Design a protein with these regions (language model features):
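Exposed extracellular interaction/assembly regions and N-terminal maturation sites
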Residues: 2-112, 187-188
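Short, surface-exposed terminal/edge motifs of secreted or surface/virion proteins that either
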Residues: 31-46, 108-117, 132-150, 180-188, ...
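Extracellular beta-strand solenoids
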Residues: 93, 102, 143, 150-153, ...
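Tight coil/turn sites that cap or link beta-strands
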Residues: 96, 127-130, 180
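Short, recurring structural edge motifs at helix starts
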Residues: 120, 159-160
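Alpha-helix capping/hinge segments and adjacent helical runs
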Residues: 162-164
């Protein structure tokens, strides 16, 4: 009786009584090879697959899963896209239940979309970013953690936190500004009383009495 394979990771299932004397080798490959080439469960949990330029045609790479417990790109935990692209890229993955950590390290500065083979949609990953995605086995690629190109705040981020918002500071000492800063003259409003001791440019004919 021939072996069968699991639906998602394609691990080999040995029929009862089969592979006498050699089943241990099959089991070891299912668990993970002792060599530098990762297989089976080990590849699915910690394996990293590089997606090079040679895997892409017209900026599209498609990966499938066959009935084999040997190394397969689509089984790897990490998909590291290193290809040189000339436009926005697409990586097609098989219709299985599988989490991926995807690195868009492609050359060319383009985003790459991860999607199920033959379907639209998917998750777009900006160049230089890393994103968790999950294929649910029902033609969907879901993102567990989207990259946020912009962030909206309820209020301006204070200067002390690296922003441009106004911050309140107390204490003594010198105020240090950048070279040639632009100073904005404050609007003081109309005071109701006060003593002016030193000023320039005040027209004395405007509402002023005294000697």
């Amino acid at each position: 009786m021939a072996s069968t394979y699991t639906a998602n990771l394609k691990l080999e299932l040995i029929p009862t009584g089969a592979q006498s004397g050699i089943w241990g080798a099959t089991t070891n490959i299912n668990l993970g090879s002792s060599s530098a080439t990762q297989t089976g469960i080990e590849q699915a949990i910690v394996g990293k697959a590089t997606l090079p330029t040679g895997d892409f045609s017209s900026n599209v790479a498609t990966y499938t899963m066959s009935d084999s417990n040997a190394t397969q790109t689509a089984r790897a935990f990490v998909l590291d896209i290193t290809a040189t692209l000339t436009a926005a890229g697409t990586v097609n993955v098989p219709q299985i239940q599988k989490p991926y950590l995807v690195f868009n390290n492609s050359v060319g500065g383009f985003a790459v979309t991860i999607r199920v083979t033959g379907l639209g949609g998917g998750i777009s990953i900006p160049n230089g970013k890393k994103v968790w995605v999950y294929t649910d086995g029902a033609n969907n690629v879901l993102s567990a953690l989207d990259y946020l190109p912009t962030l909206s705040l309820g209020a301006a981020l204070p200067v002390l936190s690296g922003g441009t918002g106004v911050t309140t500071s107390t204490g003594t000492g010198s105020v240090v500004l950048s070279t040639s800063p632009t100073l904005v003259t404050p609007i003081l409003g109309t005071p109701t009383s006060g003593t002016l001791t030193n000023a320039t440019g005040l027209p004395l004919t405007t509402g002023v009495t005294g000697t």
